[in-house]
């Protein structure tokens, strides 16, 4: 089953489940839909005999090739602070949902029964550390 969304791409090749965070303009900051997609993917792969290990990376380059911006990026800058700010001001329950789901994801990764490899290229902060462990 494929749980891809625009910001999270997944594939299985050679026994490796590969997750690519694809939100480079926001340094791959995590949104609630991204966290939910990661949870669904890792839960499915946990019991999939075709997946022997999992690797996660960021699509971490922004800007056109050859420009200074093309060298800048990150694995994951953590949670989406714009969302946090707007949700807090609005009293949006999605803010609580984000942290509940993110900590569930972190717990799943910490106890994952298969090798889990994070390619931490560039900026890694907050929730980026959580999904790298």
For every predicted segment, state its role:
Residues 57-58, 120:
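Short beta-strand/turn micro-motifs composed of small residues
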Residues 109-133:
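Glycine-rich beta-to-alpha active-site loop
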């Amino acid at each position: 089953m494929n749980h891809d969304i625009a910001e999270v791409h997944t594939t299985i090749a050679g026994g490796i489940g590969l997750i690519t965070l694809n939100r480079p303009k926001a340094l791959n900051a995590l949104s609630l839909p991204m966290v939910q997609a990661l949870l669904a993917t890792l839960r499915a792969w946990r019991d999939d005999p075709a997946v022997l290990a999992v690797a996660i990376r960021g699509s971490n380059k922004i800007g056109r090739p050859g420009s200074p911006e093309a060298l800048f990026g990150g694995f994951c800058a953590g949670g989406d602070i714009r969302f946090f700010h707007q949700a807090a001001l609005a009293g949006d329950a999605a803010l609580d949902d984000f942290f509940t789901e993110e900590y569930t994801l972190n717990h799943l990764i910490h106890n994952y029964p298969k090798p889990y490899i994070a390619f931490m290229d560039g900026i890694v902060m907050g929730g980026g550390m959580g999904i790298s462990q």
